Amino acid sequence: MKKIFVLLLCCVLVVACSDDKRYAPKEGRVSVFEAKVPILAKGSVQVATSEKVSSWSQPFYNIQNKQPNQSVSQNEKIWRERIGKPIDFNRLLATPIVIKEAIYTLDGTHKLTKTNMLTGERIWEKEIAQNKNGLSLSYTNDKLFTLSTDGLLTAFDEEGNQLWQKDFAVATRAPIIADRNILYLITTHNQFIVLNTKNGNELWRYQTTLPQTLLTNMAPAAKSKGVVVVPFSTGEVIGFDADSGLLLWIQMMVGNRPQDLTEVPQIAAAPVIEGDVVYLTGHANFSGAYSLKTGETKWTVNFGSRLTPILSGNTLFMLTTQNELVALDKKTGKAFWLKVYKTEDHPWQSISLVNSEIVLSDGEHLLYINPVDGSKIRVENKELSTLPIAIDGHLITVDESAKLTVY
């Protein structure tokens, strides 16, 4: 009887401890990364002060894809509403756009909805087209743009009136980016198309080599200081003069290691621009920092990621394809620290910075991590399928069942 009691007690202890260890850093092994990039002997992580932002106009916040250190002031749910059809293999949910306390959402069946951020009141909704799957939303100069996975591009005003529509009849997997009077579109056939926001007329385009096999979604372009940086599924990243379309530089985001299924040349992480530097992350175990104007290499590291990294203060935070969460000195590419965070049933889907804490999402939970040393802080049960967005202190999430929640 005593043996049975001890056995039952051990089982209880194991169950009680399992949740704490679910996202614990893996210990007892040396990362390939650690052997290739020396950990800094001196120096520490510094992140920018968290800020309340009042709008979110692009899939990754702005046209530089540089997400802020978001400020959230409360954690209690205010309201929750379903905005359309749930996600499945063929349906995607676009990252919401938030403008003037209104949330714009695009569901997997290409239905566009405008909702009051504070009350959850449905302002209007539009069925854009039948038999279309929504991909992305973007906003500029009082105009909203929706893109389907088969190249249907539609422009609306803030009242939901359709301004124009163009059907490119080509597969698209990269979110569209809108900047003032210009739209940037990337197709799966590796065409980069530049359009006027007024009427959708084409300004110029570029065609690179034949497409590679797509294992994930493609990354959007980024623009700053007259240069637009475009990632292609071939592993090429090209810098163009934004006005003329003149090719300025080319970088291949492919490392030195032999390719396997985890090292395809496709680029899923968006370019991130800060100042005169663009940070590029490939899927094929290769990332680096480059001159925005010339493409000159500043530093490279032999690991990759499928998630857009976070740049804040003196640090670039990245989750590698091997689940290595790493904090890099943005000037040298050397590491302040590295931790390996495992997941159970779902891969990590996003990385963000909220209230000066790194936040990883696997679709069902949010894992909060200390940016100074990479240690786990806590886990919250929050389901989401897009980036968490914080506007005026409110956290906004969309889950796989197409439920929009504001905290």
Language-model region placement:
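WD40 beta-propeller blade core
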Residues: 113, 154, 193, 238, ...
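Extracytoplasmic beta-rich repeat domains
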Residues: 78-97, 122-138, 163-179, 202-225, ...
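Structural signature of WD-repeat beta-propellers
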Residues: 107-108, 148-149, 187-188, 232-233, ...
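Sec-dependent bacterial lipoprotein signal peptides
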Residues: 1-15
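Blade/loop signatures of beta-propeller domains
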Residues: 27-36, 43-78
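Short loop/turn segments that connect beta-strands within beta-propeller blades
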Residues: 116-120, 157-161, 196-200, 242-245, ...
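Bacterial signal peptide processing site
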Residues: 18-21
